[in-house]
A protein has these predicted regions:
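Gly/Thr-rich phosphate-binding loop signature of adenosyl cofactor/nucleotide-binding cores
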Residues: 126
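Outer-membrane beta-barrel "beta-signal"
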Residues: 318-329
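Basic/polar, acidic-poor N-terminal "presequence/leader" segments
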Residues: 52-122
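Outer-membrane pore/translocation modules
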Residues: 25, 96-117, 121, 135-263, ...
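Cleavable N-terminal export/targeting peptides
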Residues: 1-79
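A cross-kingdom marker for long, charged
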Residues: 38, 42, 298-300, 307-311, ...
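Glycine/small-residue-rich hydrophobic helix-like segments
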Residues: 266-292, 297
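Conserved, mostly hydrophobic/aromatic
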Residues: 130, 301
Length: 329
């Protein structure tokens, strides 16, 4: 704009000088020279107007392009925000924290079995689970190092004072290793981790539960089916300090998740078993989710049958039906 103003000022100065000269010729009676100057001024004025229109057109085009770019940037920002919400874009998240396991709140969780003295069979259940990447490629294998934290709580919200009946805490550290198998592209990752799980209770009431595991897992995606097997080894404890010596008998050494991921819904099946023909123990959990608002918030139904839903109930058979909302899968 500054250049255009200077250019227009120069044109006005030249135009005024020529006009003064034409008027002098006209006073002297030399109408021919005066008309030539008037004609010249008319042509200059026309060219200035054309130039100004072109500049205005150019500015309008630039402004329109700017608006278009801003619109595209806004659309890109929306896509980044959505990708971040789904945990697909860590660069958008300044803390690098993303969802890990399911995050849900189930205000209606009904147990068909007794939950102990003074406990209501109806309660709420919720889970929070996050992870953060620490490092990557330290060994030159494109591996990634994570810490994660999962907390699952069973909350007696329908009782007076609404106490928490049980809360399980799971801090863990794991490494994701990529696998480069040309003939098995759907099998392309391996996870190795160490997991601590406890309910944070003291020994004085004999309700303390904890154990430590080393595990190996993988995730196999084929079309819309996701298969996640996991094997673990319990780190041995001193018998005097072991709060739950028989936990492997009820929890086994593995679990398997098989999911179908639709466009607006998912179905997940979890199986766990001790693989013993005599005195067989295990658990099954079925998860159903439907994106009712098309915004990533799912109506969620959970059915559990077996042992080990929580650490305090690891050796008790429970059958439970729960429903509520899920915000990440």
């Amino acid at each position: 704009m500054r250049k255009i103003a200077l250019f227009l000022s120069l044109c006005v100065f030249i135009w005024a000088s020529d006009l003064q000269q034409a008027l002098e010729y006209e006073k002297q009676g030399d109408y021919k020279k005066a008309m030539e100057i008037y004609k010249k001024l008319a042509l200059k004025n026309s060219s200035v107007l054309i130039s100004q229109e072109q500049n205005n057109s150019s500015e309008a085009t630039q402004m329109q392009n700017s608006i278009t770019i801003k619109k595209e940037e806004k659309q890109d920002f929306s896509r980044l925000a959505l990708a971040n919400y789904l945990g697909e874009n860590e660069s958008f998240n300044p803390l690098g924290i993303s969802s890990y396991k399911m995050n849900y709140f189930l205000p209606f969780a009904y147990s068909f079995n007794s939950l102990g003295v003074n406990n209501n069979k109806s309660e709420a259940k919720f889970q929070l689970s996050v992870k953060k990447r620490l490092f990557e490629n330290l060994l030159g294998l494109d591996e990634k190092y994570y810490i994660a934290y999962t907390q699952t709580s069973w909350w007696q919200i329908y009782e007076h004072s609404s106490p928490f009946r049980e809360t399980n805490y799971q801090p863990e550290f794991f490494i994701d290793l990529p696998l480069y198998l040309k003939d098995y592209e759907f099998f392309n990752n391996l996870r190795v981790g160490i997991l601590h799980e406890s309910n944070g209770k003291g020994d004085e009431n004999l309700q303390s539960r904890s154990w430590n595991r080393i595990y190996v897992s993988t995730a196999i995606l084929y079309n819309k089916f996701l298969f996640v097997p996991r094997l673990w080894y319990r780190i041995p404890e001193n018998k005097k300090d072991d709060d739950n010596p028989a936990i492997l008998h009820y929890m086994g050494n593995f679990d398997v998740n098989l999911a179908y991921l639709g466009d607006v819904y998912f179905i997940n099946l979890m199986l766990r078993n001790n693989l013993k023909f005599h005195n067989n123990k295990g658990a099954i959990q079925v998860d159903l989710g439907y994106d009712i608002f098309n915004n990533g918030i799912y109506w969620y139904l959970q059915y559990f049958n077996g042992y080990g839903e929580s650490l305090i109930d690891y050796n008790k058979h429970l059958q439970r039906l729960s429903t509520g909302f899920l915000i990440s899968y």
